């Protein structure tokens, strides 16, 4: 997607935890975490819909644990900050409706095996991982900085620095590239829900000074960088009252901001037996280690599975033309170093833990938290040996 030569612009967006789709994602992952904490072998596929005054949870679950769904939903909404009916969503009064079934036995028989190493993939499909040398965490610059802005937008709201802000918000960053390298930011877009009776000038000044200038390093923004803030002129009605939210509708901001491919599968509410999630995490882990090892400045990994089959049906590791090493050499090295059967992915990355609430907002990739094992660069030496460099 991104050209390698010439001058061009590339844009990525991020959303805050109060965005309705992210509210849904957080509820789904909260249910998952509650069950994994009690039963690490829980099988969870939890979807959430949120709208004015209501949260609806549906899905298929097999577990020895128990989740008090109304309590999980309300505590999640409370932590986000929807605490008043004036916002159209209040953790104390919102309705919680659920329809949870058992995991299909037809699916279970394809995943469960007498020998754990033979665990089959939970579905067919392809997953992608990506890494590049544009930022310290080996993420594309546009999505990296869009997430930084979203995190700061939430921080100034929760810390009371800009006490007129409300939970819903979005950010967007456009970078100018020259010959494949990010040079500077051409424009920034920030939209934030706010209290009524606050002037646009107050909102604009506060966001520029407390969010943008305290997030983006001096010199990163072009001299003529345009800043767009709440460009409709009013953003009082937001969150689930302004838009219905659904699990799995922010898959691009969850990953690489459009800089890499996406297989289409969402992450939130799914345990690691679902290769939509574990396969994508493994893809990121591989791509990041390839770049960190110096095998390529840019790397994309595709892994594809057949439901009920342990071994992937295809694996491709590509430098997208950025490396002196061929894609064939990179792919062979990766296959030598990494076991891509679901059981071994889950074991290597320790994915049967209640860690997913931390992944939900501001990107599943590019945040080097202790729980995010897929962000570790601990396979560098093995990859260099396998690639014979």
From Swiss-Prot:
Keywords: ATP-binding, Cytoplasm, Magnesium, Metal-binding, Nucleotide-binding, One-carbon metabolism, Potassium, Transferase
Major localisation: cytoplasm
Domain of life: Bacteria
Chain positions recorded as K(+) binding sites: 47
Cofactor requirements of the protein: Mg(2+); K(+)
Co-factor: note: Binds 2 divalent ions per subunit. Binds 1 potassium ion per subunit.
Residues binding ATP, per UniProt: 19, 168-170, 234-235, 243, 249-250, 266, 270
Pathway recorded for this protein: Amino-acid biosynthesis; S-adenosyl-L-methionine biosynthesis; S-adenosyl-L-methionine from L-methionine: step 1/1
Record-listed Mg(2+) binding positions: 21
Pfam families in the record: S-AdoMet_synt_C (PF02773), S-AdoMet_synt_M (PF02772), S-AdoMet_synt_N (PF00438)
Full protein name: S-adenosylmethionine synthase
Gene name, Swiss-Prot/TrEMBL: metK
């Amino acid at each position: 997607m991104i050209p390698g030569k010439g001058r061009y612009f590339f844009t990525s967006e991020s959303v805050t935890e109060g965005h309705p789709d992210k509210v849904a994602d957080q509820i789904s992952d909260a249910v998952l975490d509650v069950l994994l904490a009690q039963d690490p072998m829980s099988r969870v596929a939890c979807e959430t819909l949120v709208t004015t005054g209501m949260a609806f949870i549906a899905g298929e679950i097999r577990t020895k644990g128990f989740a008090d769904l109304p309590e999980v939903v309300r505590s999640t909404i409370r932590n986000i900050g929807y605490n008043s009916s004036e916002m159209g969503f209040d953790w104390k009064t919102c309705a919680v409706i659920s329809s949870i079934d058992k995991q299909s036995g037809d699916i279970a028989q394809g995943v469960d095996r007498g020998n754990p190493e033979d665990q089959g993939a939970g579905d067919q499909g392809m997953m992608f991982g990506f890494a590049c040398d544009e930022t310290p965490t080996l993420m594309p610059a546009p999505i990296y900085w869009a997430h930084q802005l979203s995190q700061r937008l939430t921080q100034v709201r929760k810390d009371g620095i800009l006490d007129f802000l409300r939970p819903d918000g979005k950010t967007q960053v456009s970078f100018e590239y020259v010959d494949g390298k990010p040079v500077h930011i051409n424009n920034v877009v920030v939209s934030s829900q706010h209290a009524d009776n606050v002037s646009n000038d107050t909102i604009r000044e506060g966001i520029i000074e407390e969010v943008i200038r305290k997030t983006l390093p001096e010199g990163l923004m072009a001299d003529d960088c345009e800043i767009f803030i709440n460009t409709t002129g009013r953003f009082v009605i937001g969150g689930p009252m302004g838009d219905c939210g659904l699990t799995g509708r922010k898959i691009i901001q969850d990953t690489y901001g459009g800089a890499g491919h996406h297989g289409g599968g969402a992450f939130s509410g799914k345990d690691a037996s679902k290769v939509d999630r574990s396969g994508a995490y493994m893809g990121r882990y591989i791509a990041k280690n390839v770049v960190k090892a110096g095998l390529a400045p840019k790397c994309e990994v595709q892994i594809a599975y057949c439901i009920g089959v342990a071994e992937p049906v295809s694996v491709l590791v590509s430098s997208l033309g950025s490396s002196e090493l061929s894609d064939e050499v990179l792919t062979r090295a990766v296959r030598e170093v990494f076991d891509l059967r679901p059981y071994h992915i889950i074991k290597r990355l320790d994915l049967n833990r209640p860690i997913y609430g931390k992944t939900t907002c501001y990107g599943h990739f590019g945040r080097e938290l202790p729980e995010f094992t897929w962000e570790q660069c601990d396979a560098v030496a093995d990859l260099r040996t396998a690639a014979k460099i």
